[in-house]
């Protein structure tokens, strides 16, 4: 029954996408993030549904290109493009093409749909629709995981959608840190109190899910995001009290197993997992020295001659456990500079442009979404200190939302006041 339902939904998306590529883009967002067919264990489990959606969407984008409404030029998009071209260069000169090419191909697919988002979703309706799809696809796990954590007293770990880049417990904590700010921002689109309460409840359950993952990176992400929010907010006293009360509630609710695991952050010398990460970070720096400018290409650390040279007798060949060291070893210092520049520029631009829009009644929704999106990026940055997800699609979708929201706000601010008033009266 589940197989039939999912397959029927895919058929509907494909048919609608052939007329409107925007529908195909939303379908891709839903399926690539949530992977609902992996929740079924029937014949649809192995069906290449993402390829089907991608094919229909690309065909429609070519046929219906007149529907494109390109986002305005912004440095974020340019740096994002340059970084992608940099990954192409590092792949071309990769130390192991067989290792690098499959991962480069996955990243290319993500970037292709980011480009389609910037081409076809530059309107209020489609921006809001895309963010709702993103929030639903990630938030589903947050609500389900939060309820499970409460029922089990936090004694079991939460895992994400099967077959996705955020399927393990660390990935779930990262996804929740990125979606919680957007959940809060969506309250501006809801008038009824009961719906707003639902938003707050969903955000709370997503937060509980982070705790339920028992991810130390998740705790680092919570602390880092909380610090950024505290710095940005004007209500520092009330937010400070809320943070303290939340911390006390967490300590009271979570079991000793969770507390013991989190305490190993301070005693990394005695913790095998934490000390291993330091060895892997050192290995990343050593790899970067092999090709410091353009890097060694995707998955270079698994190139056995490198492992034999630097790690034999020291540690096994593990993941790098850091976004930034991952980018360093694979894309070099040049790639890391572009990556950090992109991250900082996105946060600064989101905060700056949001302030222009948040006091405009017709743009408050966009300003609020843009303002909170910077905390999604902050959550990614802090949690990314401990996990290697430098190319995860969720992050690039957030960057696309930032560019689209900035574009929409700047377009509306450039219009004469009378025109904005007329559009508001017409409900546009």
Task: Tell where the protein language model's regions lie, with residue ranges.
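Juxtamembrane membrane-interface segments at transmembrane alpha-helix termini
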Residues: 37-46, 90-93, 114-121, 141-150, ...
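Transmembrane signal-anchor hairpin modules in multi-pass inner-membrane enzymes, especially those
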Residues: 1-89, 98, 102, 124-128, ...
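Alpha-helical transmembrane segments of multi-pass inner-membrane proteins
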Residues: 8-17, 80-92, 108-116, 126-158, ...
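Transmembrane alpha-helices of multi-pass inner-membrane enzymes
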Residues: 56-59, 240, 244-245, 342-345, ...
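Transmembrane helix-loop junctions in multipass membrane proteins, especially transporters and channels
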Residues: 41, 66-69, 95-99, 122, ...
């Amino acid at each position: 029954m589940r197989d039939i339902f999912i397959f029927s939904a895919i058929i509907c998306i494909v048919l609608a996408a052939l007329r409107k590529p925007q529908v195909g883009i939303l379908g891709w967002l839903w399926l690539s993030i949530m992977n609902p067919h992996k929740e079924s264990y029937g014949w649809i489990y192995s069906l290449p549904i993402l390829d089907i959606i991608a094919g229909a969407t690309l065909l429609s984008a070519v046929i219906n290109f007149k529907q494109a409404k390109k986002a305005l030029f912004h440095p974020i998009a340019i740096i994002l493009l340059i970084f992608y071209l940099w990954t192409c260069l590092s792949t071309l000169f990769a130390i192991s093409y067989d290792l690098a090419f499959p991962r480069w191909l996955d990243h290319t697919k993500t970037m292709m749909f980011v480009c389609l988002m910037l081409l076809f979703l530059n309107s209020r309706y489609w921006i809001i629709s895309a963010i709702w799809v993103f929030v639903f696809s990630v938030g589903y796990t947050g609500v389900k995981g939060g309820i499970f954590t409460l029922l089990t007293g936090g004694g079991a770990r939460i895992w994400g959608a099967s077959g996705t880049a955020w399927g393990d417990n660390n990935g779930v904590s990262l996804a929740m840190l990125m979606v919680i700010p957007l959940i809060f921002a969506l309250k501006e689109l809801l008038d009824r109190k009961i719906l707003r309460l639902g938003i707050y409840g969903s955000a709370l359950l997503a937060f509980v899910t982070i705790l339920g993952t028992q991810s130390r990176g998740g705790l680092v992400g919570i602390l880092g995001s909380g610090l950024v929010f505290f710095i940005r907010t004007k209500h520092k006293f009330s937010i400070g009290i809320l943070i303290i009360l939340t911390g006390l509630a967490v300590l009271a609710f979570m079991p000793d197993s969770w507390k013991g695991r989190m305490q190993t952050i301070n005693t990394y010398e005695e913790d095998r997992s934490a000390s291993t990460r330091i060895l892997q970070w050192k290995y990343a720096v050593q790899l970067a020295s092999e090709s410091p400018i353009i890097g060694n290409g995707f998955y270079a650390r698994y190139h056995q001659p490198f492992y034999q040279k630097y790690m034999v007798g020291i540690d096994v060949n593990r993941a790098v456990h850091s976004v930034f060291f991952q980018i360093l070893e694979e894309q070099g210092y040049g790639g890391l500079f572009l990556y950090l520049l992109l991250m900082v520029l996105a946060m600064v631009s989101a905060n700056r442009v949001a302030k222009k829009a948040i006091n405009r009644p017709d743009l408050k929704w966009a300003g609020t979404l843009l303002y909170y999106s910077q905390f999604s990026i902050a959550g990614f940055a802090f949690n990314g200190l401990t996990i290697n997800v430098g190319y995860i699609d969720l992050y690039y979708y957030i960057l696309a939302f930032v560019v689209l929201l900035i574009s929409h706000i700047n377009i509306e601010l450039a219009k004469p006041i009378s025109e904005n008033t007329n559009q508001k009266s017409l409900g546009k």
